[in-house]
């Protein structure tokens, strides 16, 4: 009798241990511990999406040549609406030389946000002497006929909607961004800068324009408010307000110009960036980890990305690209693997 009781207790304990082990395994899997243990080292093993000379492949695409290596992403969508006239001049023939083009990532149903942006910071004639444009990047809602009809009417009225054939979901924001790059290259190639921004942001266009004059030294180079952004007018303001001041200070101290003073003078007079500059600016995450717990909105499986850290990146909510940087980003996207998409 006692022997049977001992055996029953042992069996009961074994069942309990099995349950505990099973629950522990499920929890470890759910919270990503198992995936964390299987990750590859970013510092030691990073190679993504493949080994190859991407720069030379991008140069081939820019030149219109057939690349030696097949792209891994073909931008396999088409544009329902292209806002193809958005960046043309008043004659509707040539592309206008724009200072900034805003590409606003917007959900299909966010017409109220788009209307606010059109009336405020996205208004294209906000500054009379600064040519700007604003377009809105949308996916589509195939199951909502009424909403699609509303977008159609909105596009006819404002002519600023760029809509792709992919479903408008959170995980397709990567495709939406790629669509913005493609649209800029095909339909707005003469803008000096491009700002990608979400539709729940407010952008101070004035501060942005000031920043783009001298990104490295902003805001220190601004001694006084600037009312106009016309290049010739700005140069005259700078000459009259700052150049004489620097010269007077030099005469008082009876010193000759040295490189530091000359550099300061150049910052005041030659203030604009070169046309071929590669500028990519925004809030930088230098080192962050992929989310491996399956409850996370940003969960990433090892098959999608196997490394323990992301490369340094600029957050997607708001960032600015110069024309050359945008061209590089667009053509490089052909050799960048797209992860989640729906």
Where are these regions (language model features)?
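Secretory-pathway lumenal glyco-enzymes, predominantly type II signal-anchor Golgi glycosyltransferases
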Residues: 1-342
